Design a protein with these regions (language model features):
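Protein kinase glycine-rich loop
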Residues: 18-24, 29
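Glycine-rich ATP phosphate-binding loop
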Residues: 28-48
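Conserved catalytic-loop aspartate of Hanks-type protein kinases
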Residues: 202
Length: 355
Protein backbone atom coordinates (compact mmCIF):
# COMPACT_ATOMS: atom_id res chain seq x y z
CA UNK A 1 0.00 0.00 0.00
CA UNK A 2 1.20 3.49 -0.82
CA UNK A 3 2.16 5.79 2.01
CA UNK A 4 -0.20 8.65 2.82
CA UNK A 5 1.23 12.12 2.33
CA UNK A 6 -0.35 15.09 4.02
CA UNK A 7 -1.59 17.87 1.75
CA UNK A 8 0.79 20.82 2.10
CA UNK A 9 -1.79 23.50 1.21
CA UNK A 10 -2.01 26.40 3.68
CA UNK A 11 -5.41 27.14 5.20
CA UNK A 12 -6.40 30.78 4.62
CA UNK A 13 -6.53 32.72 7.88
CA UNK A 14 -8.37 35.74 6.50
CA UNK A 15 -10.87 35.23 3.73
CA UNK A 16 -14.01 36.60 2.13
CA UNK A 17 -17.07 34.48 1.42
CA UNK A 18 -18.52 35.14 -2.01
CA UNK A 19 -21.73 34.16 -3.72
CA UNK A 20 -23.38 30.76 -3.46
CA UNK A 21 -22.37 28.56 -6.39
CA UNK A 22 -24.26 25.50 -5.24
CA UNK A 23 -26.74 24.40 -2.61
CA UNK A 24 -28.61 21.37 -1.40
CA UNK A 25 -30.52 19.95 1.54
CA UNK A 26 -27.21 19.13 3.28
CA UNK A 27 -25.67 22.59 2.99
CA UNK A 28 -24.14 25.10 0.59
CA UNK A 29 -21.08 25.80 -1.53
CA UNK A 30 -19.63 29.31 -1.79
CA UNK A 31 -16.84 30.82 -3.81
CA UNK A 32 -14.32 32.36 -1.41
CA UNK A 33 -11.19 34.51 -1.64
CA UNK A 34 -8.00 34.33 0.40
CA UNK A 35 -7.35 37.95 1.44
CA UNK A 36 -3.63 37.32 1.80
CA UNK A 37 -3.10 36.07 -1.74
CA UNK A 38 -6.20 37.06 -3.69
CA UNK A 39 -6.62 33.43 -4.70
CA UNK A 40 -9.98 31.71 -4.99
CA UNK A 41 -11.11 28.54 -3.26
CA UNK A 42 -14.35 26.68 -2.59
CA UNK A 43 -16.09 26.77 0.77
CA UNK A 44 -18.36 23.81 1.56
CA UNK A 45 -20.40 24.17 4.73
CA UNK A 46 -23.21 22.43 6.58
CA UNK A 47 -24.99 22.52 9.90
CA UNK A 48 -27.22 19.46 9.34
CA UNK A 49 -26.37 16.18 11.05
CA UNK A 50 -26.36 14.21 7.79
CA UNK A 51 -24.23 16.82 6.05
CA UNK A 52 -21.87 16.97 9.02
CA UNK A 53 -21.16 13.24 8.80
CA UNK A 54 -20.62 13.49 5.06
CA UNK A 55 -18.17 16.36 5.39
CA UNK A 56 -16.37 14.69 8.29
CA UNK A 57 -15.79 11.66 6.08
CA UNK A 58 -14.57 13.84 3.22
CA UNK A 59 -12.14 15.62 5.56
CA UNK A 60 -10.84 12.31 6.95
CA UNK A 61 -10.16 11.08 3.42
CA UNK A 62 -8.83 14.26 1.79
CA UNK A 63 -6.57 15.59 4.55
CA UNK A 64 -4.25 12.60 4.09
CA UNK A 65 -4.07 12.79 0.30
CA UNK A 66 -1.82 14.79 -2.00
CA UNK A 67 -2.15 14.07 -5.70
CA UNK A 68 -2.43 16.16 -8.88
CA UNK A 69 -5.39 13.93 -9.78
CA UNK A 70 -7.45 14.57 -6.63
CA UNK A 71 -9.03 17.92 -5.71
CA UNK A 72 -6.87 19.50 -3.01
CA UNK A 73 -8.02 19.87 0.58
CA UNK A 74 -6.94 23.27 1.96
CA UNK A 75 -8.39 23.22 5.44
CA UNK A 76 -11.48 23.01 7.63
CA UNK A 77 -13.24 25.15 10.20
CA UNK A 78 -15.58 24.12 13.01
CA UNK A 79 -17.77 26.83 14.50
CA UNK A 80 -20.89 27.08 16.62
CA UNK A 81 -23.96 29.11 15.79
CA UNK A 82 -25.91 31.20 18.32
CA UNK A 83 -28.24 28.27 19.01
CA UNK A 84 -25.27 26.03 19.78
CA UNK A 85 -25.54 24.09 16.53
CA UNK A 86 -22.25 22.92 15.04
CA UNK A 87 -21.22 24.19 11.60
CA UNK A 88 -18.47 22.46 9.64
CA UNK A 89 -16.78 24.12 6.67
CA UNK A 90 -14.27 22.71 4.19
CA UNK A 91 -11.81 24.76 2.16
CA UNK A 92 -11.16 23.09 -1.20
CA UNK A 93 -9.32 23.83 -4.41
CA UNK A 94 -11.43 25.78 -6.93
CA UNK A 95 -11.49 24.07 -10.33
CA UNK A 96 -12.34 26.69 -12.92
CA UNK A 97 -13.30 24.21 -15.64
CA UNK A 98 -16.33 22.91 -13.76
CA UNK A 99 -17.39 19.28 -13.84
CA UNK A 100 -17.53 16.78 -16.70
CA UNK A 101 -21.30 17.17 -16.56
CA UNK A 102 -20.84 20.90 -17.23
CA UNK A 103 -18.51 20.17 -20.12
CA UNK A 104 -20.87 17.70 -21.77
CA UNK A 105 -23.73 20.19 -21.46
CA UNK A 106 -21.65 22.97 -23.02
CA UNK A 107 -20.75 20.77 -25.98
CA UNK A 108 -24.19 19.54 -26.92
CA UNK A 109 -24.71 16.90 -24.24
CA UNK A 110 -22.04 14.40 -25.28
CA UNK A 111 -18.32 14.31 -25.97
CA UNK A 112 -16.14 13.06 -28.81
CA UNK A 113 -14.57 9.64 -28.27
CA UNK A 114 -11.00 10.96 -28.45
CA UNK A 115 -11.75 13.51 -25.74
CA UNK A 116 -13.40 10.78 -23.67
CA UNK A 117 -10.18 8.75 -24.02
CA UNK A 118 -8.19 11.68 -22.66
CA UNK A 119 -10.53 12.26 -19.73
CA UNK A 120 -10.69 8.54 -18.98
CA UNK A 121 -6.91 8.45 -18.62
CA UNK A 122 -7.08 11.28 -16.08
CA UNK A 123 -9.86 9.53 -14.16
CA UNK A 124 -7.84 6.31 -14.08
CA UNK A 125 -4.81 8.14 -12.69
CA UNK A 126 -6.98 9.49 -9.89
CA UNK A 127 -8.43 6.06 -9.19
CA UNK A 128 -4.97 4.51 -9.25
CA UNK A 129 -3.83 6.91 -6.53
CA UNK A 130 -6.93 6.25 -4.40
CA UNK A 131 -6.71 2.49 -4.79
CA UNK A 132 -3.00 2.45 -3.97
CA UNK A 133 -3.95 4.17 -0.74
CA UNK A 134 -6.71 1.67 0.00
CA UNK A 135 -9.60 4.02 -0.83
CA UNK A 136 -12.71 3.31 -2.90
CA UNK A 137 -14.33 6.48 -4.27
CA UNK A 138 -17.83 4.90 -4.22
CA UNK A 139 -19.55 7.71 -6.17
CA UNK A 140 -17.76 8.16 -9.48
CA UNK A 141 -19.81 10.00 -12.12
CA UNK A 142 -19.47 13.08 -14.32
CA UNK A 143 -20.70 15.49 -11.64
CA UNK A 144 -17.93 14.36 -9.30
CA UNK A 145 -15.07 14.81 -11.77
CA UNK A 146 -13.62 18.32 -12.11
CA UNK A 147 -11.50 20.01 -14.76
CA UNK A 148 -8.95 22.77 -14.77
CA UNK A 149 -8.72 25.41 -17.48
CA UNK A 150 -6.32 23.24 -19.50
CA UNK A 151 -8.49 20.13 -19.27
CA UNK A 152 -6.66 18.41 -16.41
CA UNK A 153 -8.87 15.95 -14.54
CA UNK A 154 -9.31 15.75 -10.76
CA UNK A 155 -11.60 13.48 -8.77
CA UNK A 156 -13.79 15.27 -6.23
CA UNK A 157 -16.67 14.79 -3.78
CA UNK A 158 -15.27 12.03 -1.63
CA UNK A 159 -18.06 12.21 0.92
CA UNK A 160 -19.05 8.63 0.10
CA UNK A 161 -15.47 7.30 -0.12
CA UNK A 162 -14.40 4.35 2.02
CA UNK A 163 -10.95 3.30 3.13
CA UNK A 164 -10.46 -0.46 2.90
CA UNK A 165 -7.87 -1.83 5.27
CA UNK A 166 -5.68 -4.52 3.74
CA UNK A 167 -7.31 -3.67 0.38
CA UNK A 168 -10.40 -5.79 1.09
CA UNK A 169 -13.30 -6.06 3.47
CA UNK A 170 -15.07 -9.41 3.57
CA UNK A 171 -18.44 -9.90 5.20
CA UNK A 172 -19.20 -6.22 5.68
CA UNK A 173 -20.56 -5.58 9.15
CA UNK A 174 -23.86 -3.84 9.76
CA UNK A 175 -22.22 -0.65 10.99
CA UNK A 176 -19.87 -0.47 8.00
CA UNK A 177 -22.62 -1.24 5.49
CA UNK A 178 -24.73 1.67 6.69
CA UNK A 179 -21.92 4.09 5.90
CA UNK A 180 -21.52 2.98 2.28
CA UNK A 181 -23.14 5.35 -0.20
CA UNK A 182 -23.19 6.17 -3.86
CA UNK A 183 -25.57 6.85 -6.74
CA UNK A 184 -27.64 3.77 -7.67
CA UNK A 185 -27.57 4.13 -11.48
CA UNK A 186 -23.75 4.21 -11.34
CA UNK A 187 -23.40 1.55 -8.63
CA UNK A 188 -21.90 -1.87 -9.29
CA UNK A 189 -24.35 -4.80 -9.07
CA UNK A 190 -22.53 -6.39 -6.15
CA UNK A 191 -22.79 -3.19 -4.11
CA UNK A 192 -26.55 -3.00 -4.66
CA UNK A 193 -26.70 -6.63 -3.53
CA UNK A 194 -24.86 -5.64 -0.33
CA UNK A 195 -21.86 -7.83 -1.10
CA UNK A 196 -18.23 -7.04 -0.37
CA UNK A 197 -16.86 -3.62 -1.19
CA UNK A 198 -13.76 -3.64 -3.36
CA UNK A 199 -11.93 -1.42 -5.83
CA UNK A 200 -13.79 -3.17 -8.65
CA UNK A 201 -16.88 -1.14 -7.73
CA UNK A 202 -15.13 2.02 -8.95
CA UNK A 203 -14.29 0.33 -12.25
CA UNK A 204 -17.95 -0.44 -12.91
CA UNK A 205 -18.81 3.19 -12.12
CA UNK A 206 -16.07 4.30 -14.53
CA UNK A 207 -17.76 2.33 -17.31
CA UNK A 208 -21.07 3.99 -16.48
CA UNK A 209 -19.36 7.40 -16.47
CA UNK A 210 -17.89 6.78 -19.94
CA UNK A 211 -21.39 5.97 -21.22
CA UNK A 212 -22.59 9.18 -19.57
CA UNK A 213 -19.85 11.18 -21.34
CA UNK A 214 -20.60 9.55 -24.69
CA UNK A 215 -24.39 9.89 -24.60
CA UNK A 216 -25.13 12.74 -22.22
CA UNK A 217 -27.59 10.45 -20.44
CA UNK A 218 -27.63 8.29 -17.34
CA UNK A 219 -25.89 4.94 -17.93
CA UNK A 220 -29.10 2.89 -17.96
CA UNK A 221 -31.19 5.37 -19.95
CA UNK A 222 -34.11 7.46 -18.78
CA UNK A 223 -36.84 4.82 -19.00
CA UNK A 224 -35.39 2.75 -16.17
CA UNK A 225 -36.11 5.57 -13.71
CA UNK A 226 -39.89 5.24 -14.05
CA UNK A 227 -39.89 2.15 -11.85
CA UNK A 228 -37.36 2.33 -9.00
CA UNK A 229 -37.86 -1.24 -7.81
CA UNK A 230 -37.43 -2.70 -11.29
CA UNK A 231 -34.39 -0.49 -11.85
CA UNK A 232 -32.54 -1.66 -8.74
CA UNK A 233 -33.44 -5.30 -9.37
CA UNK A 234 -32.35 -5.01 -13.01
CA UNK A 235 -28.95 -3.56 -12.14
CA UNK A 236 -28.36 -5.86 -9.18
CA UNK A 237 -29.72 -9.22 -10.29
CA UNK A 238 -30.27 -9.46 -14.04
CA UNK A 239 -27.75 -10.33 -16.74
CA UNK A 240 -28.52 -7.12 -18.61
CA UNK A 241 -25.96 -4.42 -19.27
CA UNK A 242 -26.16 -0.68 -19.81
CA UNK A 243 -26.50 0.12 -23.50
CA UNK A 244 -23.08 0.82 -25.01
CA UNK A 245 -22.75 3.88 -27.30
CA UNK A 246 -23.54 2.72 -30.84
CA UNK A 247 -21.02 5.15 -32.36
CA UNK A 248 -18.08 3.90 -30.27
CA UNK A 249 -15.10 2.24 -31.93
CA UNK A 250 -14.35 -1.44 -31.39
CA UNK A 251 -11.52 -0.43 -29.06
CA UNK A 252 -13.88 1.74 -27.04
CA UNK A 253 -16.49 -1.00 -26.83
CA UNK A 254 -13.85 -3.47 -25.66
CA UNK A 255 -12.74 -1.05 -22.94
CA UNK A 256 -16.32 -0.70 -21.73
CA UNK A 257 -16.71 -4.47 -21.68
CA UNK A 258 -13.66 -4.74 -19.43
CA UNK A 259 -15.18 -2.17 -17.02
CA UNK A 260 -18.76 -3.42 -17.08
CA UNK A 261 -18.08 -7.07 -16.34
CA UNK A 262 -20.81 -8.29 -13.97
CA UNK A 263 -18.39 -10.66 -12.25
CA UNK A 264 -16.35 -8.23 -10.16
CA UNK A 265 -13.44 -10.68 -9.97
CA UNK A 266 -13.13 -10.62 -13.77
CA UNK A 267 -13.37 -6.84 -14.02
CA UNK A 268 -10.10 -5.25 -15.10
CA UNK A 269 -8.06 -3.32 -12.57
CA UNK A 270 -6.87 0.26 -12.96
CA UNK A 271 -3.34 -0.76 -13.96
CA UNK A 272 -4.65 -3.01 -16.74
CA UNK A 273 -7.02 -0.34 -18.03
CA UNK A 274 -4.24 2.25 -18.18
CA UNK A 275 -2.46 -0.02 -20.68
CA UNK A 276 -5.58 -0.52 -22.82
CA UNK A 277 -5.38 0.91 -26.39
CA UNK A 278 -8.50 3.00 -25.72
CA UNK A 279 -6.60 5.08 -23.16
CA UNK A 280 -3.55 5.55 -25.38
CA UNK A 281 -5.83 7.01 -28.08
CA UNK A 282 -6.24 10.05 -25.86
CA UNK A 283 -2.52 10.81 -25.91
CA UNK A 284 -2.86 12.69 -29.20
CA UNK A 285 -5.60 14.96 -27.90
CA UNK A 286 -4.40 18.30 -26.57
CA UNK A 287 -6.84 20.74 -25.00
CA UNK A 288 -5.62 24.29 -24.50
CA UNK A 289 -7.35 27.31 -23.00
CA UNK A 290 -10.30 25.12 -22.11
CA UNK A 291 -13.03 27.20 -20.47
CA UNK A 292 -16.59 26.44 -19.40
CA UNK A 293 -18.85 27.83 -16.71
CA UNK A 294 -17.30 27.25 -13.32
CA UNK A 295 -19.44 25.20 -10.98
CA UNK A 296 -18.73 22.63 -8.29
CA UNK A 297 -19.24 18.99 -9.15
CA UNK A 298 -21.90 18.71 -6.49
CA UNK A 299 -22.65 19.76 -2.96
CA UNK A 300 -21.46 17.87 0.12
CA UNK A 301 -21.92 14.56 -1.64
CA UNK A 302 -22.66 13.53 -5.18
CA UNK A 303 -26.22 14.00 -6.32
CA UNK A 304 -27.31 17.12 -4.47
CA UNK A 305 -28.06 18.72 -7.84
CA UNK A 306 -30.53 15.91 -8.47
CA UNK A 307 -32.34 15.81 -11.77
CA UNK A 308 -35.08 13.51 -10.62
CA UNK A 309 -37.23 12.96 -7.59
CA UNK A 310 -40.04 10.47 -7.93
CA UNK A 311 -43.34 12.35 -7.71
CA UNK A 312 -46.71 10.71 -7.28
CA UNK A 313 -47.55 10.96 -10.96
CA UNK A 314 -44.39 9.04 -11.89
CA UNK A 315 -45.54 6.10 -9.80
CA UNK A 316 -48.90 4.50 -10.45
CA UNK A 317 -50.04 5.11 -6.87
CA UNK A 318 -48.88 5.66 -3.30
CA UNK A 319 -49.38 1.95 -2.81
CA UNK A 320 -46.94 1.20 -5.63
CA UNK A 321 -44.31 3.43 -4.01
CA UNK A 322 -44.77 1.73 -0.66
CA UNK A 323 -44.68 -1.69 -2.30
CA UNK A 324 -41.42 -0.81 -4.07
CA UNK A 325 -39.80 0.27 -0.82
CA UNK A 326 -40.98 -2.81 1.05
CA UNK A 327 -39.81 -5.12 -1.71
CA UNK A 328 -36.35 -3.57 -1.67
CA UNK A 329 -36.21 -3.96 2.11
CA UNK A 330 -37.23 -7.60 1.78
CA UNK A 331 -34.39 -8.22 -0.66
CA UNK A 332 -31.84 -6.33 1.45
CA UNK A 333 -31.08 -3.76 -1.24
CA UNK A 334 -30.32 -0.07 -0.91
CA UNK A 335 -33.21 2.38 -0.65
CA UNK A 336 -33.36 6.15 -0.64
CA UNK A 337 -34.80 7.88 2.38
CA UNK A 338 -34.87 11.27 0.73
CA UNK A 339 -38.34 12.67 1.36
CA UNK A 340 -39.68 9.14 1.50
CA UNK A 341 -39.14 8.75 -2.24
CA UNK A 342 -36.56 6.83 -4.21
CA UNK A 343 -34.11 8.84 -6.31
CA UNK A 344 -31.82 6.73 -8.47
CA UNK A 345 -29.70 9.63 -9.74
CA UNK A 346 -28.85 10.95 -6.29
CA UNK A 347 -26.36 9.62 -3.75
CA UNK A 348 -27.98 11.53 -0.91
CA UNK A 349 -29.35 9.52 2.02
CA UNK A 350 -29.04 6.02 0.58
CA UNK A 351 -28.70 3.49 3.40
CA UNK A 352 -28.55 -0.27 3.71
CA UNK A 353 -31.59 -1.82 5.30
CA UNK A 354 -30.57 -5.46 5.73
CA UNK A 355 -30.77 -6.58 9.35
Amino acid sequence: MAEFSKCSCLKPTKWLKGKVIGSGSFGSVHLAMDKATGGFFVLKSTDSEAGFKCLENEVEILENLDSPHIVKFIGKDLSFEANGKRKLSLFLEFMTGGSLADVAEKFGGSLDEEVICLYTKGILKGLKYLHENGIVHCDLKCKNILLGTSGEIKLADLGCAKRIKDHKVKGITKSLSKSIGGTPLWMAPEILRNEELDFAADIWSLGCTIIEMATGKTPWGGDICTNPLAAVLKIACSNEMPQFPSHFSDVGLDFLAKCLERDSKKRWKVEQLLDHPFVSKGNSVKIKNFKVASTPASVLDGGIFSEMDFSDDQLSSDEDESTSGNALRDHGFWISTRGGKMDLESSESWINVRN
